[in-house]
Structures are given as structure tokens and as C-alpha cells.
Amino acid sequence: MYIHKYIHTEAFMSKKYAVLVVDMLNDFVTGALKCDRGLAIVPQTAKLLDGCRKKGVPVIFCNDAHIKGIDHELKLWGDHAIAGTDGAKVIDELHQSDSDYVVPKRRYSGFFHTDLDVLLTELKVDTVIMTGLHTHMCVRHTSADAYQLGYNVVVAKDATDSFTKEDYDYGIKYLKEVYGAEISDVDTLLKTL
């Protein structure tokens, strides 16, 4: 019998974390799909990433990298985060490092037809800390796939947001109730790691 993932219980293993940064790109924060609420989470997101790097916790950017005129998502949202453009680059404030990993994606989920699961498996990660935009969309879909693949999901509630408070609240509630996500804040997470 083949089992895809290890059984993740604290009784058998201590947690091995990675932080997933979803779509903290120029086009999402200040560009084509500008989100004013996205600007508000930049300081806490940067604080979490800096702390994770210092503690040796992998930082993985899951970035939209669309193909202009091809990708299905562009029909709904218009051109944004086109691969190779400034809009598809991580915002400067997050200080992307050479030690960070980048997983380009063409759909909402960071797992859909990418090598994110392979990367996490090779890093021996069992728990993902979710950050970025948007709590009710790409963060939610990435969290769903993480859960389905057997990862524990933690959401840094002050390092993720959505276009509106209602969308954010819906996303947080859904992640907690449907995937059993632990909802925490950056300061608490940095003490836990």
C-alpha cells in the first residue's frame, strides 16, 4: 500500500515549518490588481520572513507568472503578473533573498501543476505558514491543496489579507473550519519557531 505523506502528529515528530508567501507581487500590491489592504500587511510579512530566515525556516514565494494571451485566469482578472514583467516581481519591501525559493504558478493554488509539493517533501516540511494575498482566493486554494496533501496549515493572520474585510474574514473562517488551520499572528509564530 502506498501512502503519499507521513502521518503528521506531534506524538511522532516535531513540526518542520516553511513559510509560503503567496502573490506579494508588484501587480497585487500597487499595480494592475492593486490591493490597499495588501500594503498594510507588508511590515508584518517582512518581519516574519526576516525572522524565518534567521531561524533557518525556508521561505518560499508562490508567485503568479502568467503567459499573456494564454492563461485562463486572465480572462477573469485581466492582465496581471505576466511572467518576466515588473508586475510579476516580489515587492522590494520583502527583501527576497538568494536563500529563498520561488515557485511560479499559473493558477490560484501554489501546488497546481508546480513542483511545490516536491520542494516541501525534499525540505522535509510538514507544516506550512501561509502569508500573502488573497486570503479568500490564492491563499485559500494553496491551503486547500496543502491540507489535501497532508500538510498542517498555519495562517499568519496579520500577514495575509484580501480586497475587503469581508473577504478576509470569510477566508480566515473557511481555512479554520474546513482545513483545521491554526490561526496565529506573526509575533506568536516567531516565538514558536
Predicted regions: what they are:
Residues 2-18, 46-55, 79-193:
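Active-site-adjacent betaalpha module
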Residues 27-31:
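Short acidic, Gly/Ser-rich segments with clustered Asp/Glu that frequently serve as metal-coordination loops
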Residues 70-74:
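Metal-dependent catalytic neighborhoods of phosphoester/phosphodiester hydrolases
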Residues 20-22, 63, 157:
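Active-site flanking residues adjacent to catalytic metal/cofactor-binding acidic residues
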Residues 65-66, 160:
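Glycine-rich beta-alpha junction loops
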Residues 26, 67:
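Short active-site segment of divalent metal-dependent hydrolases/proteases
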